[in-house]
């Protein structure tokens, strides 16, 4: 039970000014008469016990018994032994010291009495049995001395040892008031652990402190320790939240929107093993190296076949003044790459836009988009050499109609729901989230440096079947193109656009037409022979007839075609390419001046 319950009756006396101020009592006997008029009945005691006030019942019973007795008998007697050695006893978990001088103070004495009354149920029962413990014997009053008569004390029991308390006097009204004041000032001893309901709530921590952190991304060398970081490239787009461990950082872009790409050296160009302060960088949009070059080119051809114009490029550079202030010699080395020269002692910035969607590489609807890579290769072009010195990559997903912002918001909501479901989850290693409305985290994405400087990127030029970048600004042409025929793919190169071949879809149809197949037989034969022309021209036809019938190709001088209406015409490349595929003919051979003359009669 608490000390608050122990002092309940005392608090009533202290806090009720009527008890002490309404009537001018001369001593405590008159003051207690008002309380004795309402005796402490058994019913009252039972109600107090039901409420858990056992100690208050014992204390009130003691006070009632004390003041109901004659004043002459209110003496606390003690044994003649005085302060003997038996006074130091361990009674009910309390060690009584022989020196009781501190009990002469009213405050300490009342505290001592209350603690013993409230802490010892056996002791309170003994008090109720004997009721001879006088308050005057316990509470000393200055100016009046009361001697302790010899003889055994009535407070003693068979299980209790005697001890001596100082002499006491009658306690007047003013002293009683001051005593209650001092008792109220002494904090009661806590006897139980306080209820958690009354504890001060601990300071609440943020729900997701790791998400609300808005500190900027550390520089690239700290993001990717152990990788070469002589150069540092950033893309001006927020970094995606959900990134798998070990993968390159990812950014969401809108189709056709220009984003700044910043290139710099952390040390300001100092300590770099370069032959010149100017380097050439190639910014390109490529597929991951896991895809073979043939598959990458197939994807690019499929994308280009669906574009409205042959001039449509994968990557574009904005014609803004800031580009030309920091970079020089901008060239479009391929449809998915551009190059420029910049000074390593200064920061370079270009604005690029990507014109393809991640879902443009499949004709099926609902297929997940293919992620692309934004790759930047930097070459040392000094002293007539072109040496690849640095490469960095980041993943990009391209959306249309502000889809990048919607994707970021969706990722934020997913991250929030995951955090709410698992508030104690620590799965935040490769993932960064955002909770606040409009919060986009870090507004830049750092490109991760790559250690593989050997793999050549696959670049796409529609009029070349295969092209691979060997040096910045140079492309390896396909067979049949000499180095002198190499076209510079600059932005202002109009001849290239004018001489550009039809779209890949039309090219595919033309390829089907170029595969010319003829069905021929002689008049004496009933079954046709198939003549597959290696090339859809007259030379291809002569070569096929020579191989089929064992004739020398150089001896075939004339080839004619006789229409159904009997018109005889000279066979030429145009007729073979456009009017002879899958056509059946009767083959008639004749000799003229030692040369072979062939007539194909249309059936």
UniProtKB/Swiss-Prot annotation:
Region feature (Transcription activation): 30-95
Phenotype of null mutants: Mutant pups display neural tube defects and don't survive to weaning. During embryogenesis, fail to form the epidermal barrier and exhibit defective neural tube closure and embryonic wound repair. The epidermis show a severe barrier function defect associated with impaired differentiation of the epidermis, including defects of the stratum corneum, extracellular lipid composition and cell adhesion in the granular layer. Embryos have thoracolumbosacral spina bifida and curled tail, and 2% have coincident exencephaly.
Alphabetized Pfam families for the sequence: CP2, GRHL1_C
Keyword Iron: no
InterPro entries: CP2 (IPR007604), TF_CP2-like (IPR040167)
Domain Grh/CP2 DB positions: 226-461
Main location: nucleus
Subcellular localization(s) per the UniProt record: Nucleus
S-S bonds: none
BP-aspect Gene Ontology terms: central nervous system development; cochlea morphogenesis; ectoderm development; epidermis development; establishment of planar polarity; establishment of skin barrier; eyelid development in camera-type eye; gene expression
Cellular component GO terms held in the UniProt record: actin cytoskeleton; cilium; cytosol; nucleoplasm; nucleus
PROSITE patterns: GRH_CP2_DB
Kinase as UniProt keyword: no
Subunit structure: Homodimer, also forms heterodimers with GRHL1 and GRHL2. Interacts with LMO4.
Miscellaneous note of the record: GRHL genes (GRHL1, GRHL2 and GRHL3) show a paradoxal lack of redundancy despite their extensive sequence identity in the DNA-binding and protein dimerization domains and the fact that the core consensus DNA binding sites are identical. They have related but remarkably different functions during embryogenesis because of their differential spatiotemporal expression patterns during development.
Family the UniProt entry places it in: Belongs to the grh/CP2 family. Grainyhead subfamily.
Function: Transcription factor playing important roles in primary neurulation and in the differentiation of stratified epithelia of both ectodermal and endodermal origin. Binds directly to the consensus DNA sequence 5'-AACCGGTT-3' acting as an activator and repressor on distinct target genes. Essential for epidermal differentiation and barrier formation at the end of embryogenesis with TGM3 as critical direct target. Exhibits functional redundancy with GRHL2 in epidermal morphogenetic events such as eyelid fusion and epidermal wound repair.
Protein name as it appears in the record: Grainyhead-like protein 3 homolog
Lineage, top ranks: Eukaryota, Metazoa, Chordata, Craniata, Vertebrata
């Amino acid at each position: 039970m608490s000390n608050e319950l122990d002092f309940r009756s005392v608090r009533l006396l202290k806090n009720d000014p009527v008890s002490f101020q309404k009537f001018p009592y001369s001593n405590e006997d008159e003051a207690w008469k008002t309380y004795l008029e309402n005796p402490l009945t058994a019913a009252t005691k039972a109600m107090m016990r039901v409420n858990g006030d056992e100690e208050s019942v014992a204390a009130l019973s003691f006070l009632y018994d004390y003041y109901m007795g004659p004043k002459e008998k209110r003496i606390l007697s003690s044994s003649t032994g005085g302060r003997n050695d038996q006074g130091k006893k361990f009674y009910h978990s309390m060690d009584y010291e022989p020196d009781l001088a501190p009990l002469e103070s009213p405050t300490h004495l009342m505290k001592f009495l209350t603690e013993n009354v409230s802490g010892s149920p056996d002791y309170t029962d003994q008090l109720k049995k004997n009721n001879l413990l006088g308050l005057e014997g316990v509470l000393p009053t200055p100016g009046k001395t009361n001697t302790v008569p010899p003889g055994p004390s009535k407070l003693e029991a068979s299980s209790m040892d005697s001890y001596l308390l100082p002499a006491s006097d009658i306690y007047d009204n003013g002293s009683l008031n001051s005593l209650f004041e001092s008792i109220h000032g002494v904090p009661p001893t806590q006897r139980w652990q306080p209820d958690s309901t009354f504890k001060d709530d601990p300071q609440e921590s943020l729900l997701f402190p790791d998400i609300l952190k808005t500190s900027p991304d550390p520089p690239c060398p700290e993001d990717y320790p152990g990788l070469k970081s002589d150069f540092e490239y950033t893309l001006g787009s927020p970094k995606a939240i959900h990134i798998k461990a070990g993968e390159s950082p990812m950014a969401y872009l809108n189709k056709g929107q220009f984003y700044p790409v910043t290139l710099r050296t952390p040390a300001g160009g100092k300590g770099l093993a370069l032959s010149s302060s100017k380097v050439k960088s190639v910014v390109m949009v490529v597929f991951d190296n896991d895809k073979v070059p043939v598959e990458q080119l197939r994807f690019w051809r499929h994308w280009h076949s669906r574009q409205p114009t042959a001039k449509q490029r994968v990557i574009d550079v904005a014609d803004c003044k800031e580009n030309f202030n920091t970079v020089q010699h901008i060239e479009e080395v391929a449809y998915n790459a551009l190059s420029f020269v910049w000074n390593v002692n200064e920061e370079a910035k270009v604005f690029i836009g990507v014109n393809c969607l991640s879902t443009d590489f499949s004709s099926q609807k609902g297929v997940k988009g293919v992620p692309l890579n934004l790759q930047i290769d930097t070459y040392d072009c000094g002293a007539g050499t072109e040496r690849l010195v640095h490469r960095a990559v980041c993943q990009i997903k391209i959306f249309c109609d502000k889809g990048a912002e919607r994707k970021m918001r969706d990722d934020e909501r997913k991250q929030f729901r995951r955090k709410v479901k698992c508030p104690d989850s620590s799965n935040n290693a490769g993932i960064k989230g955002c909770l606040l409305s409009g919060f986009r985290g870090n507004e830049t994405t750092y490109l991760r440096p790559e250690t593989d400087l050997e793999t050549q990127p696959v670049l796409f030029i529609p009029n070349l079947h295969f092209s691979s970048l060997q040096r910045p600004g140079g492309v390896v042409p396909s067979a049949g193109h000499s180095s002198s025929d190499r076209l510079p793919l600059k932005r202002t190169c109009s001849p290239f656009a004018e001489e550009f071949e039809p779209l890949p879809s039309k090219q595919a149809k033309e390829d089907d037409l170029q595969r010319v197949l003829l069905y021929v037989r002689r008049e004496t034969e009933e079954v046709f022979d198939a003549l597959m022309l290696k090339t859809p021209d007259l030379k291809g036809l002569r070569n096929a007839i020579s191989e089929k019938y064992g004739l020398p190709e150089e001896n075939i001088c004339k080839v004619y075609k006789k229409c159904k209406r009997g018109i005889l015409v000279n066979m030429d490349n145009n007729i073979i390419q456009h009017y002879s595929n899958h056509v059946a003919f009767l083959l008639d051979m004749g000799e003229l001046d030692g040369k072979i003359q062939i007539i194909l009669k249309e059936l």
